[in-house]
């Protein structure tokens, strides 16, 4: 069930897991993609070596619920990344979309001391309001999320943390959104990936009576995007003057080349 796609000449996405058993109230993925399943570690290693032979230097590990890797085989996500860290053929790995309740302290500590896993996390929050998280049927409360961010920043101060957030979920009252906004604004994260809530037939969210008007949903998206822009600016500014390793990926017509630092700062060199 492995698949990979090339994002750039030096980087590719490797899908190590598919499907989901979580049944969040707004989401149809468990119905569309089936139950959670993943490849064996030995097959992931083989796929990584295969893409390395094509000149790929960086792999982003992806999945619907990446941290759920191996649950049906007895292997674990931590087992996987420990094994991949020994793979000489690939310079860099990144972890994409790992649920906060599956982002263990052991995983964070491993990345902090890893040779090949970059100081870069992508963790879905979805809402900064516990009331809305309950309506979403998420498996954590915001306090757990804040603890994970704090753990990352304590062990890896320069880590880039990207966060998924949904705006305008059914049941997200003005008070709940303001509560979420304040919580998110106070998080020491680097960027928000903001999505407007959209209705999905067959989901439990449709049973929630309070509907956010479309114009208000749009306003909330923009409010969160403004927070994201400020956070990304602050993260970049904090690193001005530093020297960090860069994997260059492309060149433009003018001859400049671009790439990303280990902690996911975009740079261009003339």
Predicted feature descriptions by range:
Residues 53-174:
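Conserved SAM/AdoMet-binding glycine-rich loop
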């Amino acid at each position: 069930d492995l698949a990979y796609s090339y994002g750039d000449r030096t980087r590719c996405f490797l899908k190590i897991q598919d499907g989901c058993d979580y049944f969040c109230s707004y989401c149809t993925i468990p119905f569309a993609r089936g139950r959670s399943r993943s490849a064996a570690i030995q097959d992931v290693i083989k796929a990584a070596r295969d893409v390395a032979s094509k000149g790929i230097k960086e792999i982003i590990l992806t999945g619907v619920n990446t941290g759920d890797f191996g649950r049906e085989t007895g292997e674990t996500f931590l087992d996987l990344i420990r094994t991949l860290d020994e793979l000489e053929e690939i310079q860099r790995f990144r972890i994409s979309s790992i649920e906060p309740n599956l982002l263990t302290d052991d995983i964070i500590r491993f990345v902090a001391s890893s040779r090949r896993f970059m100081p870069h996390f992508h963790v879905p929050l979805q809402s900064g309001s516990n009331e809305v998280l309950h309506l979403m049927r998420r498996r954590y409360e915001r306090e757990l999320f804040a603890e994970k961010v704090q753990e990352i920043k304590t062990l890896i101060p320069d880590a880039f943390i990207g966060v998924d957030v949904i705006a305008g979920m059914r049941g997200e009252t003005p008070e709940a959104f303001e509560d979420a906004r304040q919580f998110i604004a106070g998080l020491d994260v680097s960027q928000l990936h903001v999505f407007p809530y959209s209705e999905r037939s067959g989901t439990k969210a449709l049973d929630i009576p309070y509907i956010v008007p479309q114009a208000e949903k749009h306003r909330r998206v923009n409010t969160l995007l403004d927070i994201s822009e400020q956070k990304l600016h602050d993260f970049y500014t904090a690193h001005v003057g530093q020297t960090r390793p860069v994997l260059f990926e492309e060149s433009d017509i003018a001859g400049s080349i671009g790439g990303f630092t280990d902690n996911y700062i975009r740079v261009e060199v003339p």
